[in-house]
Regions:
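A gly/proline- and charged-residue-enriched helix-loop-helix capping module
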Residues: 144-159
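Bacterial N-terminal signal peptides that target proteins for export
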Residues: 2-13
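Short, solvent-exposed secondary-structure boundary motifs
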Residues: 1, 157-162
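N-terminal secretory/targeting leader peptides
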Residues: 25-144, 163-360
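C-terminal motif of bacterial Sec signal peptides marking the signal peptidase cleavage site
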Residues: 19-23
C-alpha cells in the first residue's frame, strides 16, 4: 500500500475510533486550569483550511485539558505544520487523555498506533536509563541551567537514546519547578526531620523524601488537600500552578523555595511516522516543534506568575532556602544519584558543569 494512502487510511480509522471512545477518556493529570492564556484558546478548528486533499492526517495525544499550556502548544504546533505545508500535513490533537494516559500513549507511539504525543520525562525514563540524569533532585542551578542542558549537546545525546526504542523526541516543553509546602514554617534540613510529605507514587521522589529525613506518603493528587487537612501529611510538593489550582495554600500556607526538581516534558513523534516523512518534511516538523515549545514556555511562565501572585495575595508565606541549607539538601542526594545514575555519573558531572561560572 502506498505510504501516503496508508497514513490517510490509518488517520481516518483513528478519527472514527477516538470519536467513539471520547466518553471513556481518562482524567487529565495534575493541574486542570490555566491562566495567562490568550483571549481565544487554540483548537483543532483554529487552523487555516486549505482546499487540498492532505497527504497525511496525523494524531497527537495530550492528557491535559484544552486550556493547559502543553495542549495549547500542541495546537500551535499543528497550526504551524498545517500552514508550512499548505494543508498537505494535518495534525489532529486529542486532549483530556482521550487516547490514554502517558504510559499507554508512549507504547502506542513505539509501534505506530499514534503519531505524536507530549509526555513527561518522568514517564519517558522507562525507555532510557540515561535520561534519569535529567531529573535528579537539586541538579540544576536555575531554569537557564536546565534549558542550556536540554538544548545543548547533552540534551541531544539523551534525545537520541530514545530513538532505538521507537520514540523520536522533537522539542522540550516547560513544566515548572517543584517546591515543598507545609502547614508550618520549614527552612532547614533539621526541620524536615520526621515530617510526613505527600509525593507522587514515583520511586525516585519517595527516595528523595527519605534521604531528607522525612516520610513519604504517596497520595493521589485529588486527595492531597484532605490528607493535609486531616493531619495525615505535614505538607506536599509541587509547582506554583498546581499549588494554586488545588487550593493547597489553604491548608499548607508555607511555601519553601527549595527548587528540588525540574522535570521537563517532550514533544515526541513515533519513529514509524518519522520514517514515512521526507527529509524536507522532517525539517518542517522539527522547526514547527521548536516554535511551539517557545509558545508553550511563554504560556507556562504567565501561568506561574499569576498563580504565585494569587496565592501570595491570599496570605501564603514564601520562604527562601539559604545557599548553605540548599547545599545540605543537595549533599543528601548523593546516594540517590548513585542509585539511579551510577553508570552515568560522568554525564551528571557534565550537566553540573554546563554553564557554570568559572571558579575565582
Amino acid at each position: 500500500m502506498n505510504k501516503h494512502i496508508f497514513a490517510l487510511f490509518r488517520g481516518a480509522v483513528l478519527l472514527l475510533g477516538f470519536a467513539l471512545l471520547t466518553g471513556c477518556a481518562q482524567a487529565p493529570a495534575e493541574v486542570s486550569s490555566v491562566s495567562g492564556q490568550p483571549s481565544a484558546l487554540l483548537t483543532n478548528e483554529s487552523a487555516i483550511v486549505y482546499n487540498v486533499t492532505p497527504e497525511y492526517v496525523f494524531t497527537y495525544a495530550e492528557n491535559q485539558t484544552e486550556d493547559y499550556p502543553t495542549t495549547q502548544g500542541a495546537y500551535r504546533f499543528a497550526q504551524l505544520v498545517n500552514k508550512r505545508t499548505q494543508g498537505r500535513i494535518q495534525i489532529r490533537v486529542y486532549a483530556n487523555a482521550q487516547l490514554g494516559d502517558e504510559t499507554s500513549t508512549l507504547e502506542q507511539l513505539r509501534f505506530g498506533g499514534l503519531d505524536f504525543a507530549r509526555c513527561s520525562l518522568s514517564t519517558m525514563t522507562a525507555y532510557s536509563e540515561m535520561s534519569n540524569a535529567l531529573m535528579l533532585p537539586y541538579l540544576y542551578r536555575d531554569a537557564d541551567h536546565m534549558w542550556a542542558v536540554l538544548e545543548g549537546e547533552i540534551g541531544r545525546k539523551i534525545s537520541d537514546s530514545f530513538i532505538e526504542t521507537g520514540l523520536v523526541p522533537l522539542s522540550w516543553y516547560d513544566a515548572g519547578v517543584r517546591n515543598f509546602y507545609f502547614t508550618k514554617p520549614v527552612s532547614t534540613l533539621d526541620e524536615m526531620q520526621g515530617l510526613v510529605i505527600r509525593v507522587q507514587p514515583v520511586e525516585m521522589m519517595e527516595d528523595m523524601i527519605r534521604l531528607l529525613g522525612a516520610s513519604a506518603l504517596p497520595v493521589s493528587y485529588e486527595n492531597v488537600y484532605s490528607a493535609i487537612q486531616r493531619g495525615e501529611a505535614d505538607g506536599a510538593e509541587n509547582n506554583w500552578s498546581s499549588y494554586d489550582a488545588m487550593h493547597h495554600n489553604e491548608v499548607a500556607p508555607y511555601y519553601l523555595l527549595d527548587e528540588h526538581m525540574r522535570v521537563p516534558e517532550s514533544q515526541i513523534i513515533s519513529a514509524v511516522t518519522w520514517d514515512l516523512l521526507s527529509v524536507e518534511d522532517r525539517q518542517i516538523i522539527k522547526e514547527c516543534s521548536a516554535l511551539s515549545a517557545d509558545y508553550e514556555r511563554m504560556l507556562w511562565s504567565a501561568r506561574e506568575d499569576e498563580a504565585r501572585a494569587r496565592v501570595m495575595e491570599s496570605g501564603c508565606t514564601e520562604i527562601t532556602l539559604s545557599e548553605d541549607e540548599k547545599k545540605k539538601f543537595r549533599d543528601a542526594m548523593e546516594p540517590l544519584y548513585k542509585k539511579y545514575c551510577g553508570d552515568y555519573m560522568d554525564l551528571v558531572d557534565q550537566i553540573r558543569q554546563t554553564g557554570a561560572p568559572d571558579p575565582q
